[in-house]
Amino acid sequence: MARSITVVTTFSDAGWEQYGKRFVETFVQYWPKDIKLKIYCDSVQPGYPEVEWIKLNAACPDLVTFKERHKYNEHAHGVRPDGKKKSYLWDAVKFAHKSYCVSHAALNSTTDLIIWLDADVVTHSPVPFEFIESLLPQNHYCAYLGREKIYPECGFVVYDTKSEYNKIFMQDWQALYNTDSLFEEVEYHDSYLFWQLVKKHSANGMQTTNLSKGHPHRPGVHVFINSPLGEYMDHLKGKRKKDGRSKPTDIYYKRDADYWKKL
């Protein structure tokens, strides 16, 4: 029997205008109708009955508390512990939104699987249900885009919400923020914290799947579009949002989709 699936993401009102609207429209156009879409948001956007809109602050009060607690803490907003420069690697507040959304969705899921999908992803080709479900083998808790000697690319992660590891994994993730213990880590962003949690729970028997296996996954390589996901989606990381698509130099594998032929 096929497993039920919900895709989860979040964006602000400003993010809706910049990339969120395109995310939703291409999702509705190309994803299977029996895969649900849940969006944690500031404001509900009218005209999209296919979407379950969740008011972020109401659903995640601990996020509101965390942000208020660190409102004036520059180290929680990207300034390195040594104070020398600012970087996303230490922007705990920015990436807390994603962490709280993932954990809330996973702990309150009504479907077998949830998929975190960054809102700056564009779907360019029809996505087969069977392809999506096949990404996470039975008895594996999560599937993600691994990279060598560096934190994973977490723009796409599949979680089995029925797994025995789901509750403890997500509660541990929330606890990093609720207790401020994330500031004891080398980096503070969601991908690094996810990486540490995967290593911790894998040591206790949790099984995972690396979707980048057999594909380029070195630091600096656009691992998302060079994985099997690239056949159906583009991830507009960083400055690619302004361009509206990835660059030809990002591609390491021949792609058959018309979308990539137009680069």
Predicted regions mapped to residue ranges:
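N-proximal low-complexity "stem/linker" segments adjacent to membrane-targeting elements
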Residues: M1-K21
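Catalytic core and acceptor-binding pocket of nucleotide-sugar-dependent glycosyltransferases
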Residues: S163-L263
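Residues at the starts of beta-strands that form the adenosine-phosphate
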Residues: S4, D34-K36
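GT-A fold catalytic core of metal-dependent nucleotide-sugar glycosyltransferases
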Residues: K94-A143
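Active-site-proximal specificity loops/subdomain of glycosyltransferases
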Residues: P46-N108
